[in-house]
Amino acid sequence: LMVLTHYDDDHIGGILQLVGTCLDDNVALAKEVWANCAGYVEMAENKSTNAKQGVTLSVKLNELKEKHEIIWRDDLSEGFKTNLPFASIEVVSPPETIRRMVIKKQEEEGQQLLKASQMNIDNLKKSITELTEYIPKEPDLNKDAELANASSIALILKCDDLSILMLGDCYPQNVERYLREKGYSEDNPLVVDFVKVSHHGSRNNTSNSLLDIIRCDKFIISTNGGNCRSNHPDRITIAHILCHEKRNKDRKVHLYFNHKKELIEANGAPFLNAGECKEWNFEIHDNITEL
């Protein structure tokens, strides 16, 4: 019997590694698995099963279940009792109401994933110029994830003749405010050799107004396409980079990705249409490990 009590990081690391090893070696995990929260837990990339980052533990448990006929229970709540050959077990928590809250939240997040995927598909049908009208939303600092991103360290790195604006996962409003306070503007832009685009190219972390006060033709986007809760880069972000008002259309823009474009789009969603590189005078450099 293997029991995954809940989905905090400090409780799942060893189990994730064990599940990955069992899939690699084609061996059974256990005769029975208890895991109410498997839908929350993301699996790391698995070399032999071609599992994508972001595949949930529930998917992998189903694979093991089919291969090795393990019993997987995801309905455990207080009052459940069972007798095993080596012990008797009685579940004393969680209450059924809490278990149902977890199920509801998983279902809601599943719907959000479908909505996000559909949004990327819909955006592919829209022109680059149309997408530039999107205005990034203000972060909700009452949400843990958005507070964490808002606290992200962004910096200007200068070394010899090289300068890079490294934006971490920060929000554009904070960076734009700071740069304007330092005297940068549309008529006096910050000039850098590279911009590391914020938050893997998420649509809410890059804005036209920020790009309008930066002069740069080379943009680094660090992403493998996203995970089960988001897809990156957003086509909207690409649109901002290519079409913000102050961009010099005569200068070619270079987009650098640390993974192959095919992998990024397979994990996430397509973000470019045929012919757009020529139309908007930009070039994709993928699977880049050094600049």
Where are these regions (language model features)?
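Flexible, acidic/histidine-containing loops and adjacent segments that form or flank the divalent-metal
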Residues: 22-163, 251-291
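Long, well-ordered mid-to-C-terminal structural blocks that present hydrophobic/aromatic surfaces
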Residues: 155-208
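Conserved phosphate-coordination/catalytic loops
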Residues: 142-149, 201, 231-235
